[in-house]
């Protein structure tokens, strides 16, 4: 009888717990400086654009573009925010905000938060992700990892 109750308990637990899976996105792109406000020799505000491509571990790929602002004080990037648009097949879109604080900038690690998404991928909305980024001249490579429900792209 104990086994029967254990099986029933496990069934209900598995029914109510949403399974989580890793959603990994790799982004490649080119950075272009649009405008700089140079306040002093060590302080400035830069506006950048990014155009590139992405692919994920679910077989999706597409184009991405970003609007970025970067605040530098005493030659140290104090704040960096990137507003990103991901364009999938069939006019599916996702938008996220990538942030990095001054502590995160040295390590090249930050956070993504998906803010707006098409209905086809609605489970991605409000997903928080960790990303890392590497630069080479005006190009970059970013990889993010998100924990999302298994139904997010089904």
Each predicted region: which residue ranges?
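Sec-dependent N-terminal signal peptides
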Residues: 4-13
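Beta-strand-enriched cores of mature, soluble protein domains
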Residues: 19-154
């Amino acid at each position: 009888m104990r086994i029967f109750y254990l099986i029933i308990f496990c069934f209900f637990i598995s029914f109510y717990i949403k399974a989580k899976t890793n959603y990994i996105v790799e982004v490649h792109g080119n950075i272009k400086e649009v405008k700089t406000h140079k306040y002093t020799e060590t302080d400035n505000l830069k506006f950048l654009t990014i155009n590139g491509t992405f692919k994920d571990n679910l077989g999706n790929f597409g184009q991405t573009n970003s609007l970025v602002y970067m605040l530098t004080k005493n030659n140290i990037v104090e704040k960096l925010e990137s507003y990103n648009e991901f364009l999938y097949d069939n006019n599916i879109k996702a938008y996220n905000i990538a942030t990095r604080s001054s502590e995160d900038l040295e390590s090249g690690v930050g956070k993504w938060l998906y803010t707006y998404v098409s209905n086809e991928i609605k489970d991605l909305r409000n997903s928080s992700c960790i990303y890392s980024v590497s630069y080479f001249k005006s190009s970059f490579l970013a990889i993010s990892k998100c924990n999302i429900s298994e139904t997010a792209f089904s």
